[in-house]
Amino acid sequence: MTSLKNKTLFITGASRGIGLAIAKRAARDGAKVAIAAKTAEPHPKLEGTIHSAAKEIQDAGGIALPIVCDIRDEEQVARAVALTVSTFGGIDICVNNASAISLTNTGATDMKRFDLMMGINTRGTFLVTKSCLPHLKRASNPHVLMMSPPLDMHPRWFGGHVAYSIAKYGMSLCVLGMAEELKKDGVAVNALWPRTTIATSAIKNVLGGEKLISMSRSAEILADAAHLVFSQPSKTFSGNFLIDDTFLHDVGGVTDFEHYRIDKTMPLAPDFFVPADSKPPLGVKIARISELA
C-alpha cells in the first residue's frame, strides 16, 4: 500500500470520531494533517477538541495543524485552506467528513435544523472542495473523499428523515458531478460509506446509546478504507461509491474484519443507505432490523 508520508490532508470534522481516525491512520505514515473543525473547547457531551486531536495525530507520527473553522462560512474556509497551504506547501487530499444529523420527519424538522444539515453536509462539502481544488490540481496524486452514501434512491431511505437524506445525498451528488468534471484534471473524487453503524458520538447520543455502540464497528475500518482509497491512482480511480468492508476485501485483500467489532458477542447493526444488493464479504453477518429491538 502506498505511503502517505509528507502528503498533506485537509480534513473537516476531524476533532473526533471518523475524521480523527482517518487523520491518525495517515499520521502513522508521517503525513501532514490540517484539522478543520469547530470544537476548540471541550464539549459537555462530545469527546475531543481540535487541540486534543492534534496531539493524537502528532503522537501517531504525523504533523498536525488545528484550525477552528465553520465550513458553512466562505471566509473561514478560505482562511483555513490558505493557512494549510502556507504551512505545508499544498494540499494533496481533501476529506469531507463533517456532517450534521437529525433523524426527524418533515413536520418535526424545523428550518433551522434543515439549514444546518444542508449548510454543513451539502454546501460545506461543495465549498471546501471548491476551495481546495486549485491546490489539488497541482498535487501528484490528488484525492477528494466524501464520507457519504451510494445514491440508492429507494424510498425507504427518505420516508423517515427526508431532510437528512437530502443533505447526505447532496454530498454524494457532489461526487457524481465532480468526478466527471475533474476527470480531465486527474483529481479523483470518491465516496466512502460504512456497511455497519460506527462507534461514534452520533451513534451514542443521537441514535441508539450504548447498545448500538456494542453492535457497531470502530472508526478504524473507515480509516483503513480511506487510506486504501488514497493509495489508488487518481487519474483512473474516481467516481466510485464504496462500502468499507467490500472495498477492503475486493481491493485490499482483507478477509478478517473481526478486529473492527466493538463487541464480538453482539450482532452487527446495518447502517442507513446501504443498497439491498450490496452483499458483505464472505463470513460477515449483518443483523436484521428485527434483531435490533
Predicted stretch roles:
Residues N105-T106, D110-D115:
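Substrate-binding pocket helix/loop in short-chain dehydrogenase/reductase
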Residues G48, V68-A80, M111:
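The beta1-alpha1 cofactor-binding region of Rossmann-like NAD(H)/NADP(H)-dependent oxidoreductases
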Residues K137-R138, P142-K184, W193-T197, G208:
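Catalytic loop of short-chain dehydrogenase/reductase
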Residues S15-R16:
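Conserved glycine-rich cofactor-binding loop
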Residues K7, G62-I63, G90-I91, L136-P150, ...:
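Active-site loop of short-chain dehydrogenase/reductase
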Residues A191-L192, G209-L292:
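C-terminal helical subdomain
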Residues D29-S52:
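Conserved glycine-rich Rossmann-like NAD(P)H-binding loop of the short-chain dehydrogenase/reductase
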